[in-house]
């Protein structure tokens, strides 16, 4: 058992179901396109349970844990698989082709019976899924929003609030948008736009690379990076989505002076894991929104990350699959302040002892 392994191809996406890890990898001449299933253990990448060689490069994975079904997007279609009860095989159960044929898909999300799909051109589509017994019976398009963004849709999240259903999208155009999809018989309705430009006036082209939404709290976190190579910066922002008509930025911090590519939330919603393009991981404490630890674990871009309990699993374009323990530590300033407080208390206690003749030092 190891905490880092080389799987021989660039890692594009990760998906965790129960204590298993699915890895989508491939791309590049002479490199194999693969779907691999691993057993996860605390601190280690365990046994390889399944390895499928694919004809096309799997770019992104999303799944439905309760049904042991997941999908991968490959250019203009999504291929759905079911996982056998003994975790020993994948079975292809449905292929959804997206028109037009030159469409390049980069994101999708499944919530209950609804599938939302985003492509490289900023188009947004909505589908209804009919499930059978660990299978998909049919998928039908129920909505479409032309030019939802003017660049690719990197991430999609669902939000339910007061019996209403919304989509949140994050795009390479630097914007996040909210759409009302409550009534599937009516067109998708644009509600509002929120952007890092509300907070930061530096003339730079910022891209919304990733988005995490916390249901119940109606809080979202976005990671946005500058595309200006000379002034490359990445920021993490916390947003209040309780009023979908007027999204409010709550906090923002500078994470890195390099572009950051992905983020994920740990299971108790207390920490974020963030990866950058030069092999570094950041752990962010959401209580106060501060980086509590950062660690250089490689030299290549860490393209994706997923939390498994209090461990962060990362995949790099340099073929490395790795698992690292969440490390939180006191900020140095806090330690200094604590030292000063203890020193003052010690002096006060010494004065008290001297004043009451409880101590007698002779030199």
Label the model's feature ranges.
Residues 303-333, 358:
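Blade-level signature of beta-propeller repeat domains, shared across WD40, Kelch, NHL, RCC1
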Residues 21-23, 70, 115, 167, ...:
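Hydrophobic beta-strand positions that form the internal "hydrophobic ladder"
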Residues 33-40, 78-82, 124-128, 176-181, ...:
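WD40-repeat beta-propellers
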Residues 8-16, 55-63, 100-110, 148-159, ...:
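Canonical WD40 repeat/beta-propeller blade segments in eukaryotic WD-repeat proteins
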Residues 1-4, 20-51, 75-87:
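Beta-propeller domains
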Residues 1-6, 44-53, 87-104, 134-152, ...:
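Inter-blade linker and blade-boundary elements of WD-repeat/beta-propeller domains
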């Amino acid at each position: 058992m190891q905490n880092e392994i080389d799987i021989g191809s660039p890692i594009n996406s990760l998906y965790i179901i129960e204590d298993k890890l699915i890895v989508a990898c491939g791309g590049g001449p002479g490199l194999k396109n693969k779907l691999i299933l691993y057993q996860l253990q605390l601190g280690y990448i365990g046994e390889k349970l399944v390895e499928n060689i694919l004809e096309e490069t799997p770019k992104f994975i999303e799944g439905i844990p309760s049904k042991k079904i997941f999908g991968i997007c490959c250019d203009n279609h999504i291929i759905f698989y079911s996982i056998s009860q003994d975790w020993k095989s994948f079975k292809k159960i449905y292929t959804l082709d997206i028109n037009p044929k030159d469409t390049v898909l980069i994101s999708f999300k499944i919530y209950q019976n609804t599938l939302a799909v985003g492509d490289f051109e900023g188009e947004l589509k909505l589908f209804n899924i009919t499930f059978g017994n660990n299978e998909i019976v049919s998928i039908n398009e129920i909505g479409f929003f032309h030019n939802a963004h003017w660049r690719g849709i990197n991430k999609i999240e669902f939000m339910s609030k007061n019996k209403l259903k919304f989509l949140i999208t994050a795009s390479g155009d630097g914007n996040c948008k909210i759409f009302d999809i409550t009534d599937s018989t009516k067109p998708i309705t644009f509600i509002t736009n929120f952007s890092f430009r509300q907070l930061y006036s530096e003339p730079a082209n910022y891209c919304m690379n990733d988005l995490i939404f916390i249901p119940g709290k109606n809080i979202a976190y976005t990671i946005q990076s500058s595309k200006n190579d000379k002034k490359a910066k990445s920021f993490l922002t916390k947003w209040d989505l309780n009023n979908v008509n007027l999204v409010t930025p709550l906090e923002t911090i500078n994470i890195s002076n390099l572009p950051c590519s992905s983020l994920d939330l740990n299971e108790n919603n207390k920490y974020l894991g963030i990866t950058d393009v030069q092999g570094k991981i950041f752990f962010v404490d959401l209580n106060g929104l501060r980086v509590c630890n950062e660690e250089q674990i490689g030299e290549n871009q860490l393209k994706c990350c997923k939390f498994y309990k209090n461990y962060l699993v990362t995949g790099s374009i340099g073929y490395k699959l790795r698992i690292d323990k969440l490390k939180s530590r006191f900020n140095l300033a806090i330690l200094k302040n604590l030292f000063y407080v203890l020193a003052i208390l010690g002096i006060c206690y010494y004065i008290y002892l001297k004043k009451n003749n409880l101590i007698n030092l002779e030199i």
